Amino acid sequence: NASMLGSAMRIDANQQSKLKDNEVRNGYVVFDADKLQQYYDEQIKPNLKLEREDKKVVVNNAGEVLSTETEGHDGIVIADGADTEVGARLAQVLATGTGSVNVDGKVDPKQEVKVTHRVAIDLSDRKLYAYENDTVVKTLNVVVAEGNDNVTGECVGMMCTPTGDFNVWQKLPSQDMSGTLNLADGTVETWDVKDVGFVNYFSSGCAIHRIAGGYVADAVMPSIANGSHGCVGIGWDVAEWFYNWCNMGTSVHIQV
């Protein structure tokens, strides 16, 4: 940098004159090591590094790795004490007209950062909470089984959404759902529903999926009575987000 070099040097016609402690000479040209060091500290040093990016993995409650969000990379920083005399060394190189100035670096190893994805579903308030560690990142309205009371969430019928702790064991972007249930009162319940979207199975035949029967937005879900055979229905406008966020193996807790 020509302007930097100009500000760090002066012309002295008397080659025998006494120099300051921070100065060196090349003929009539005197170089100021302190000014060279200042330029390095302010203009060059801030760019002599590569910021570390940690590897980010998604895990479930058991600590099992479900996916890798970012691979990350090591960082590079200046080695301790490697640049304390850059100004003096550079001044010497300029004074002699030979050599170079090298600054040693060291690796700042990337770390692995674990983020726990988990789902909590409360049947009493009919909400699904998507957690990343201990932070709720999204709250969705849900419609659950017809046997669950719409206010208390208690199982008061023959077809209820199961409670307890589960893991997502199968995911399908779309599925035709059909089945038959022989109920305790002797009746037989059958269904055949086409194109159920964004399906996340967590317990046997029970899944979290886009609510069937046509478009329903998340905001409208609270006005719909419970009516599934055990599945958890979510709004059409949030189903794809949840499907992409919820990995295979994600922990699911369902409570009343």
Where are these regions (language model features)?
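Exported/periplasmic cell-wall-interacting domains
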Residues: 37-38, 47, 51-52, 179-256
